């Protein structure tokens, strides 16, 4: 067995002791009040904080809800790559999910307020019905109905079997 290493004696008190700095604020982030504004195109937006905005806009005759990160380009805030544009149907689905999401976050131990959603009953396990989900369910039902139909066997009779069947018919 190799000899055990001896620990170096800590005799030098002259060396500085370094401690690790904690990252960021140790306290919980407080929700900011949303400030309403308007961009150069006339679209209304609300500041979410940290150069993030939520706004509505029209693109090719379609109204979109944008949640996007912005960057400073020479004193002018420009939209960045990070973000999402939701159609109105997707936005409606998001609004339906928010009470359930809040309940899930509360279950994880986060303090979440429900401004504007206090009237809505929280449905923790209720499925969200979308047109696509309904279409998939109707497809599944039609496939099940097709499976219930009796099927004819797909067996080809070989020439040897045909001759044997003809011989039996001739014998009768």
From Swiss-Prot:
Any single GO CC term annotated in Swiss-Prot or TrEMBL for this entry: nucleus
InterPro entries with a match to the protein in the record: PC4_C, ssDNA-bd_transcriptional_reg, Sub1/Tcp4-like
Main location as per UniProt: nucleus
Alphabetized Gene3D superfamilies for the sequence: Transcriptional Coactivator Pc4, Chain A (2.30.31.10)
Chain intervals for the UniProt region annotation (Disordered): 1-43, 123-172
Keywords: Activator, DNA-binding, Nucleus, Transcription, Transcription regulation
Localization terms from the record: Nucleus
Basic and acidic residues composition bias: residue spans: 131-144
UniProt key word Nucleus: yes
Ranges of biased composition (kind: Acidic residues): 158-172
Bias type Polar residues, positions: 24-43
One GO term (biological process): positive regulation of transcription initiation by RNA polymerase II
Family: Belongs to the transcriptional coactivator PC4 family.
Name of the protein this chain belongs to: Putative RNA polymerase II transcriptional coactivator
